[in-house]
């Protein structure tokens, strides 16, 4: 391909609303153009990268035995109402009506539609297992689209759905997809981690997220460097910091703490370590009998993990209590709350670490007062104990193999074991060997195709622009002739190299735009093509051209007779 037949539109400066590196560089490189909030045109350079990503995903999905189909972007509300997600999804699900006032959803995922296909087409155990996948446009009506394509509203996603006879079959399908994802991300040439995760709104019994490691990642990735343990922050298990509770050494004392409403203020006022304080978090659950108030206790230097809190029996649909509810239950305003002398029945849940603390400090349920020397069993009943907190670096790894570290990651893939969550609600059944009706066991497996672009850039860039991994670069090689429109020798040699690389199946572009060398080089460094060949009169007089890899600090001279072989050998490696 020649640049004059392509479309290249680069910018010297990023738009003012571009926040992160990938957004800035994609806009500057002319890969995307903003059309609306969270909605982008994918320009030719960007679309070439998307197609490279899609091809790798498609090859590995086919290799894994999945079958490609395509499901509608617009889906009837009735299917979503069958599973309850029509209401549960909230405003992120874009709803619309047609001219007949019938309700539809713009798909964010396609569990309902694919389950409808399965229940219509699959009758017997002989038709299982099967795994359907699509690469399709999705839409989520994000409240605050940001970071370019990283958190856009319209995006391209590969979503796959497996159907099995039993849980053993589901486990095999899940492992098959997990292995396929590992191959996919390795082929992309990205540093990534697969981590244990929570299933979230999709539901099910087990899941892993695939994260591209990047300092700018939104997600915290917890891992043990001396073992295989890895999880996202929501799912990472926090062990108690001491194995056994020490015996009390202090008396319970109601202590004056004037206007000290934060744990840090209390610790400083009492001249005690922050980690001896316990903070109170008040939640509520609603029922026909009225709200139930819950008191969650976390060590003052730790943070509540809301996903873990929702897994405490009875707290699945919690909300944070109102100030009126707090005053009514505790007789005190926030800032002085604790588990002693509460005014109404409150369910007390202590984090594992708090449950093993002794002689701790907490609110006294009285303005300007806290209790010191608090001990379980002596001063208040033993609590419900649960893992409620986020882990911190240095915590013991749950597998007992070392301590935990935390890095940042960008989620680009997710695999779920759904079980019968959808098949039961939509009556997707089959007849087993004994003629008995059974619900299908389902798994679902997503990869954010367009998000891969942003994640790859966040991991691979420098001050000059993008550095694409070879497998997903828009072009493998760019030929930059200096004076292409002025020198017959330069034109002839550039055309020869271009033709030979094309004949060898290399994805190459020749820049015949007639731009000055500085502009030409800057454009291709910004766009991030991995290999560059420069042809000029000065080098040709010595029978040489210049080769430079995108990560190379300096160019090297290569003979004109060897340059095609040199580039091909680099591509092969």
UniProtKB/Swiss-Prot annotation:
> Where is this gene product found?
Cytoplasm
Q: Which UniProt keywords apply?
A: Aminoacyl-tRNA synthetase, ATP-binding, Cytoplasm, Ligase, Nucleotide-binding, Protein biosynthesis
Give the Enzyme Commission number.
6.1.1.15
- Which CDD domains does the record associate with it? ProRS-INS, ProRS_anticodon_short, ProRS_core_prok
Q: Which GO terms describe its biological process?
A: prolyl-tRNA aminoacylation
* Disulfide bond sites: none
Reactions the enzyme catalyzes: tRNA(Pro) + L-proline + ATP = L-prolyl-tRNA(Pro) + AMP + diphosphate
The record's Pfam families line, in alphabetical order, gives: HGTP_anticodon, tRNA-synt_2b, tRNA_edit
Enzyme category, top tier: ligase
Q: What is its main location?
A: cytoplasm
This protein's GO cellular component annotations are: cytosol
Question: Does the entry feature the keyword ATP-binding, yes or no?
Answer: yes
Could you tell me one molecular function GO term of this UniProt entry?
Answer: proline-tRNA ligase activity
Identify the HAMAP family for this entry: Pro_tRNA_synth_type1 (MF_01569)
**What free text does the record give on domains?**
Consists of three domains: the N-terminal catalytic domain, the editing domain and the C-terminal anticodon-binding domain.
The record's function comment reads: Catalyzes the attachment of proline to tRNA(Pro) in a two-step reaction: proline is first activated by ATP to form Pro-AMP and then transferred to the acceptor end of tRNA(Pro). As ProRS can inadvertently accommodate and process non-cognate amino acids such as alanine and cysteine, to avoid such errors it has two additional distinct editing activities against alanine. One activity is designated as 'pretransfer' editing and involves the tRNA(Pro)-independent hydrolysis of activated Ala-AMP.
The record ties this protein, via PANTHER family, to:
MITOCHONDRIAL RIBOSOME PROTEIN L39/PROLYL-TRNA LIGASE FAMILY MEMBER (PTHR42753), PROLINE--TRNA LIGASE (PTHR42753:SF2)
Sequence similarity: Belongs to the class-II aminoacyl-tRNA synthetase family. ProS type 1 subfamily.
Q: Fill in the subunit field for this protein.
A: Homodimer.
Q: What name appears for this protein in its UniProt entry? A: Proline--tRNA ligase
Its taxonomic placement starts with: Bacteria, Pseudomonadati, Pseudomonadota, Betaproteobacteria, Burkholderiales
């Amino acid at each position: 391909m020649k640049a004059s037949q392509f479309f290249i539109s680069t910018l010297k400066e990023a738009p003012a609303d571009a926040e992160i590196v990938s957004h800035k560089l994609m806009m500057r490189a002319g890969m995307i153009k903003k059309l609306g909030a969270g909605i982008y045109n994918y320009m030719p350079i960007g679309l070439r990268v998307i197609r490279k990503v899609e091809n790798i995903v498609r090859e590995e999905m086919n290799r894994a035995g999945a079958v490609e189909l395509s499901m509608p972007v617009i889906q009837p509300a009735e299917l979503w109402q069958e599973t309850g997600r029509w209401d549960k999804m909230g405003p992120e699900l874009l709803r619309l009506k047609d001219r007949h006032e019938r309700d539809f959803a713009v798909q964010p995922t396609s569990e309902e539609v694919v389950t409808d296909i399965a229940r219509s087409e699959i009758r017997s155990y002989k038709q299982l297992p099967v795994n359907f996948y699509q690469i399709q446009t999705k839409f989520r009506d994000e409240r605050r689209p940001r970071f370019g394509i990283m958190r856009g509203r319209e995006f391209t996603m590969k979503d796959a759905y497996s159907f099995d006879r039993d849980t053993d079959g589901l486990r095999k399908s899940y492992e098959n997809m997990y292995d396929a994802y590992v191959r996919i991300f390795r082929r992309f040439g990205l540093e990534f981690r697969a981590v244990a995760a929570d299933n979230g709104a999709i539901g099910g019994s087990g899941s892993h997220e695939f994260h591209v490691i990047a300092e700018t990642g939104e997600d915290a990735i917890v891992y043990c460097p001396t073992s295989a343990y890895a999880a996202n922050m929501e799912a990472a298990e926090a062990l108690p910091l001491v194995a056994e509770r020490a015996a009390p050494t202090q008396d319970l004392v109601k202590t004056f703490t004037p206007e000290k409403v934060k744990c840090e203020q209390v610790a400083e006022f009492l001249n005690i370590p922050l980690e001896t304080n316990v903070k109170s978090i008040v939640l509520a659950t609603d029922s026909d009998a009225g709200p139930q108030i819950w008191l969650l206790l976390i060590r003052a230097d730790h943070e509540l993990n809301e996903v873990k809190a929702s897994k405490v029996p009875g707290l699945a649909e919690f909300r944070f209590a109102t100030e009126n509810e707090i005053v009514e239950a505790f007789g005190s305003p926030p800032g002085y709350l604790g588990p002693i002398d509460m005014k109404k029945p409150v369910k007390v849940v202590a984090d594992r670490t708090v449950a093993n603390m002794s002689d701790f400090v907490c609110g006294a349920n009285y303005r300007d007062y806290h209790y010191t020397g608090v001990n379980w069993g002596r001063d208040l009943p033993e609590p419900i104990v649960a893992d409620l907190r986020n882990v911190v670096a240095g915590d013991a790894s749950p597998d007992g193999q070392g301590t935990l570290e935390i890095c940042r990651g960008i989620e680009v893939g997710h695999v779920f074991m759904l079980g019968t969550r959808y098949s039961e609600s939509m009556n997707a059944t089959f007849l087993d060997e004994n003629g008995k009706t059974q619900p299908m066991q389902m798994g679902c497996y997503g990869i954010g195709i367009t998000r891969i672009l942003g994640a790859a850039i966040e991991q691979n860039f420098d001050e000059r622009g993008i550095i694409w991994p070879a497998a997903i670069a828009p072009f493998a090689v760019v030929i930059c002739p200096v004076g292409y429109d002025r020198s017959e020798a330069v034109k002839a040699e550039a055309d020869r190299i271009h033709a030979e690389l094309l004949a060898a199946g290399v994805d190459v572009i020749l820049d015949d735009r007639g731009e000055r060398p500085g502009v030409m080089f800057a454009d291709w460094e910004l766009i991030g093509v991995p290999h560059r060949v420069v042809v000029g009169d000065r080098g040709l007089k010595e029978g040489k051209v210049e080769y430079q890899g995108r990560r190379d600090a300096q160019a090297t001279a290569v003979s004109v007779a060897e340059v095609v072989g040199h580039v091909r050998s680099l591509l092969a490696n």
